[in-house]
Every structure is written in C-alpha cells, then in structure tokens.
C-alpha cells in the first residue's frame, strides 16, 4: 500500500479544527508544524516549564496529513475544510511517501545487547551471537525493560554477579520481567515479579513463557508474605524512598538488595533512607545513573 502527505498552510486559529476534521474523514495521521520554522519569523510555541503558553498554535501553521494514495486529496481537504468551518479550502501540495518495509525497518533498529559477562538480550528475529551466551529473548514492547537503559543494565550486571543457585528473588517494579527472567536463568529458585501496571504484568508473563522461565507475577496486593534472599527494585528515587520500609522488610537478614532508577546526584539521599535497615552504598555508576546495593543487617 502506498501513501501520500497532504500539506496545507493556514492561520493558527484554523489549524486544530482542520486537523480534527481530517482525522474524522479518514486521514491516517495528522501533525501540525510551524510554517515559519528555520526562518526569522519562527515562533517558539511554549515558554518556561509550568507556565501556560500564550499561544496554542503557530501564527502560520502547516498541517500535514498522511493519506492513502487511493484517496482524492482535493475532495478530502475540501470536505475537511467545510467540516472545520473554513470559508474556503486552503491551497495544498502533495508529497509522495517512499514505500518501506516498516517491519524490517523497525527490526533493523534493535540489535542484540551484550551485558555483563555472558548476558545477551536478543530480539526474536536475531540469533544468539555466542553459543555459550546467557540469552534473554525479548522484543521491544509496552513494558519498560529491554536492557538498553543504564538502570536495567546495572541491575542485570549485579544479578549476574550475585544470584546463587536456589535463592529466592523478588523483582519489585518488574516491567517487562527482564530482571526476574534473568534471575531465573542465573539459577534462582522461587522468583516473584511485582508491578503496579496490569499491562506490564501481562507482558512479563508473556516474556517469561517465551524464555521458559518459571516466574510468578502479580500486582502489589499479590506480593507474597515472607522474605527473600534477593530483592531488586529498578523504579525511581521517590517511590524507592517511600517504599523503603516495605522493601527492606522483604529482604532476609543477611540477604541482598539492589536499587536503581536513581541518578548519581540522588544516591546519597536514597541511601540515607535505607541506611536504617540496610548496609548500602553505590555499587556501580553508568551514564549518570547508579545502582545501590547492600545487605540487610542481621539485627534488624
């Protein structure tokens, strides 16, 4: 199937109405740009963060609609202009959109990722680069965690070095399930993944099935009672601080915990909250992010 871009320029007061009408009448997508971009008349649309912008569209707006090549653009634009209440149909130009194998193009942007000593995160359309690799088959999807983000990488490196055969592991904020799956592949016994997002829980279950990893997933209310040998939480600094008591209570005395989703400048603040329960410090830093790791004190 081939496509074309219908490009029309018009005053800002009509841009939103025309865009909405084009979508209602069958345009596949619509975007609005500054028609004066890269000229002396270019106008910034937004000001300082937190302030209400003075304008919600550019003085001279360019509306770009992606349409099926079988659609008559003149008829479509005339109908949209009438629907939007314009006095006349704007002038327009057509641009041919080069046909692409979009699946192949998307796949080409995701290559296998090497992490730690033996870990490879491999999309389903690739083969494992090394015969002795510890392979996690994972495709980009709706849930966070494909190994590309520094925090995920840090936690994976820590798990590879930490997990011992048969240990119990809790992945709190599991996202795609990548850390829970890795823990299982590293030899862990009972592994549990918890996430606040039901969609992430379903994605994690699917990924575990694909990787033949026996992991139990659920929402926070499903988190089992009791303690774990290892707890890992790759979330963000504020939730980590709020959940410090709960997460620390999930670690067995003498057990290990790793926390990430923490910027280097936030490390001391997060560590100080956990210091009541855990002997904790920065384990490793990567691209401005840190992984904090420690051991729960026997006396707590």
From Swiss-Prot:
Its EC number is 2.1.1.-. Gene3D superfamilies: Vaccinia Virus protein VP39 (3.40.50.150). The keyword Methyltransferase applies. It is found in: Cytoplasm. Keywords: Cytoplasm, Methyltransferase, S-adenosyl-L-methionine, Transferase. The keyword Nucleus does not apply. One of its GO terms (cellular component) is cytosol. It catalyses: L-lysyl-[protein] + 3 S-adenosyl-L-methionine = N(6),N(6),N(6)-trimethyl-L-lysyl-[protein] + 3 S-adenosyl-L-homocysteine + 3 H(+). GO terms for molecular function: protein-lysine N-methyltransferase activity. InterPro entries: Ribosomal_L11_MeTrfase_PrmA (IPR050078), Ribosomal_PrmA_MeTrfase (IPR004498), SAM-dependent_MTases_sf (IPR029063). GO terms for biological process: methylation. It holds the Pfam family PrmA. S-adenosyl-L-methionine binds at residues 152, 173, 195, 234. NCBIfam families: prmA. Methylates ribosomal protein L11. Belongs to the methyltransferase superfamily. PrmA family. This is Ribosomal protein L11 methyltransferase. It comes from Burkholderia pseudomallei (strain K96243). The gene is prmA.
């Amino acid at each position: 199937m081939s496509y074309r871009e219908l490009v029309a320029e018009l005053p800002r007061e009509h841009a939103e109405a025309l865009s909405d009408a084009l979508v209602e009448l069958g345009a596949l997508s619509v975007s609005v740009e500054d028609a004066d971009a890269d000229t002396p008349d270019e106008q910034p649309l937004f000001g300082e963060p937190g302030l209400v912008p003075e304008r919600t569209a550019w003085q001279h707006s360019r509306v770009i609609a992606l349409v099926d090549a079988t659609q008559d653009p003149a008829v479509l634009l005339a109908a949209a202009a009438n629907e939007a209440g314009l006095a006349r149909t704007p002038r327009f130009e057509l641009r041919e959109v080069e046909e692409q194998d979009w699946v192949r193009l998307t796949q080409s942007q995701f290559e296998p990722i090497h992490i730690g000593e033996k870990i490879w995160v491999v999309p389903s359309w690739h083969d494992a680069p090394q015969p002795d690799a510890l392979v996690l088959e994972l495709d980009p999807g709706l849930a966070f965690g494909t190994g590309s983000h520094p925090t995920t990488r840090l936690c994976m490196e820590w798990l590879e070095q930490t997990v011992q055969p048969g240990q119990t592991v809790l992945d709190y904020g599991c996202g795609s399930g990548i850390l829970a799956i890795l823990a299982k592949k590293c030899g862990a016994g009972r592994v549990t993944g918890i996430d606040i997002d039901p969609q992430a829980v379903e994605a994690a279950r699917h990924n575990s099935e694909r990787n033949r990893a026996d992991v139990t997933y659920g929402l926070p209310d499903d988190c089992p009672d009791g303690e774990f040998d290892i707890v890992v939480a790759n979330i963000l600094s504020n939730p980590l601080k709020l959940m410090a008591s709960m997460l620390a209570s999930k670690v067995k005395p003498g057990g290990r915990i790793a926390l990430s989703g923490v910027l280097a400048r936030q490390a001391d603040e997060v560590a100080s909250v956990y210091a009541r329960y855990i002997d904790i410090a920065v384990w490793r830093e990567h691209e401005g992010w840190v992984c904090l790791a420690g051991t729960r004190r026997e006396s707590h």
